[in-house]
Amino acid sequence: MNSILSSVLPAPEDPVLSVIFACRDDPSPVKLNLSAGTYRTEEGKPLVLDVVRRAEQQLANDLDKEYLPLNGLPEFNKLSTKLILGDDSPALKENRVVTTQCLSGTGSLRVGAEFLATHNKESVIFVPNPTWGNHPRIFTLAGLSVQYFRYYDPKSRGLDFKGMLEDLGAAPPGAIVVLQACAHNPTGVDPTFEQWEKIRRLVRSKSLLPFFDSAYQGFASGSLDADAQAVRMFVADGGECLIAQSYAKNMGLYGERIGSLTIVCTSEDVAKKVENQVLLVVRPMYLTPPIHGASIVATILKNSDMYNDWTIELKGMADRIISMRQQLYAALEARGTPGDWSHIIKHIGMFTFTGLSEEQVRLMAKEYHIYMTYDGRISMASLSSKTVPQLADAIHAVVTRIA
């Protein structure tokens, strides 16, 4: 009998999952996984925010399990839009914003990509080099042609701002540009406010369409407003943009898959047409989104006491990550580790490019049981005061051994 499925080829190795599996299979009691993008406490445990537990307790008696509308929970959409754009956003006042609840950041990006592939005449999308590993796959599968613009400078371990402007300046009018709103993944390198303004001017002068990935609002600096600054700058000029939001990191709702796609249009009339077309994308994809995560977020955002408590817990997470950066830098300096490690405290958010080579990274795993992606990215949120010395010792050893 002929087998249709026997001709299926093996899938290519996922660079992040392969590291996670290697760490899982390592029997060492001191193994350390710095590859996954999830927050951990000082004790190395997953964190459920107290305010999330309170919201769930409140919902336990009130929540039904009916289908949501295609565009999701209306209350969630309204509150989520205000969170990213600000209460006083002119785009909101002029009713030219469309928000659709989606399946976290990934789902929001995919719905936006499918919409753009159908309705944007220029099908090329520019993403940073490097960028989150899932970005190219999401956009390619949606039918967009992915190209890259320079972003990270390995020599300075900072932003290649000149290269970025040159590449975006050469992009064709109408091209889509993916911009991470804050806490760039995987590098931890963000533009300054002044650099963002120059990026905005270039994007608008070239008639490019910005698509923001906002996965870490409040998780980078500890301030929800500061981390939305770049997005609001683009919205304030009256132009168009798309924004994918996620509550996986800033509310710890990883498994609830809760996010939203917001599309800022030039007029209310355009927004109405865009809304209907987005729903045509959603309907055959998953029909309606889940209710539980959206209800948690809406409960927290609409209650002033809960919102306040959330901002305190959120700042606590951001501050702990900043502290891990400071401790790691100090530990490397104390050991006299060769090289300049100041980029660790200059970077922001969950991730940092260490600057380690693939050879050094593999040695870290083999001899020191410390796992990170092969490009040298580590999750600062997975470190603790107890494991910083362990990491610093290993980095010092491999850098000294392999120049």
Swiss-Prot record:
Q: Name one GO molecular function term.
A: pyridoxal phosphate binding
Which Pfam families does the annotation name?
A: Aminotran_1_2 (PF00155)
Cofactor(s) this protein requires: pyridoxal 5'-phosphate
Q: Tell me which Gene Ontology terms the entry assigns under biological process.
A: 2-oxoglutarate metabolic process; aspartate metabolic process; biosynthetic process; glutamate metabolic process
Q: Where is the PTM N-acetylmethionine found along the chain?
A: M1
> What's in the GO CC field?
cytoplasm
Q: What class of enzyme is it?
A: transferase
Lineage, top-rank taxon, reads Eukaryota
Key word Transferase present in the record? Answer: yes
User: Which residues does the record give as L-aspartate binding sites?
Assistant: G37, W132, N185, R377
Keywords (alphabetical) are: Acetylation, Aminotransferase, Cytoplasm, Pyridoxal phosphate, Transferase
Catalysis: reaction(s): L-aspartate + 2-oxoglutarate = oxaloacetate + L-glutamate
Supply the SUPFAM superfamilies for this chain: PLP-dependent transferases (SSF53383)
Q: Where's it found, cell-wise?
A: Cytoplasm
CDD domains membership = AAT_like (cd00609)
Q: Which residues are reported to carry the modification N6-(pyridoxal phosphate)lysine?
A: K249
Q: InterPro entries annotated for this entry?
A: Aminotransferase_I/II_large, Asp_trans, NHTrfase_class1_PyrdxlP-BS, PyrdxlP-dep_Trfase, PyrdxlP-dep_Trfase_major, PyrdxlP-dep_Trfase_small
Asked whether the keyword S-adenosyl-L-methionine is assigned, the reply is: no
The EC number on file is 2.6.1.1
How the protein assembles, per its UniProt entry?
Homodimer.
State its role. Important for the metabolism of amino acids and Krebs-cycle related organic acids. In plants, it is involved in nitrogen metabolism and in aspects of carbon and energy metabolism.
Q: Provide the family line.
A: Belongs to the class-I pyridoxal-phosphate-dependent aminotransferase family.
Q: What else is known?
A: In eukaryotes there are cytoplasmic, mitochondrial and chloroplastic isozymes.
Name listed for the protein in its UniProt record: Aspartate aminotransferase, cytoplasmic isozyme 2
Chain's gene name: ASP4
